[in-house]
Amino acid sequence: MKKILGIVALFALIVLSCFYFFTKQPKNIFDEIYQETEKTYRTNNILRHIDGFEISPGWPSDDPNNLYTPFGLYNKEKTPSDYSEIEIGFNFRSSQKVLFIYSERSLSSNVSVKIWGSYNYKFGVLSKEATIIKKENNSKVYIDDQSEVKSYLEQYGVTAKDLDAYYDEIVNQKVLKDWCSIYDSKYSPSNYGEVKVETQWENW
């Protein structure tokens, strides 16, 4: 009887181990970036290997306010001239688990559009969103109300097709290509893998 129970327990352990291994396997390119950075951001952040990408100088940090939120920026030489910055950041808190990639593109001397690619690791969802940034009195005002964002973009002649092009230029052709250059990815900028994509401007 004990032998049978031992065999059953061993079998259950094997099944659980296989299940755990399977569920932890990256199902898409954003899973890869999230998992590999989570493993390394406290020691030798894997993203340091991207040419021209600079981890925020305060990392790694033991400050409880930003312990789980590492980020970095591309330097000016590696940032296309139409953009003021490109950032890759994370929130590794168990309640969040988010990877975000954003770029800021100028529309005028005091107005720019921020294109977000936010990946929710827990749910496997990539959200593509746009925010307007206005410079007022040496400070920045962020506008994320969808109708206001759309109105501003229309004023500057920016269409949904343009937003797709901005997203593709930075996320696909820049960040994800760079990722594939430093990591033996199963995926690519044209093949994300298993991920649900939600686009804010899809029906604009």
Residue locations for each model-derived region?
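Hydrophobic membrane-insertion alpha-helices, especially the h-region
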Residues: 4-22
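N-terminal export/targeting and maturation segments
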Residues: 16-109
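Extracytoplasmic electrostatic interaction patches
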Residues: 75-204
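Generic detector of bulky aromatic hydrophobic side chains
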Residues: 4, 8-10, 40-43, 55, ...
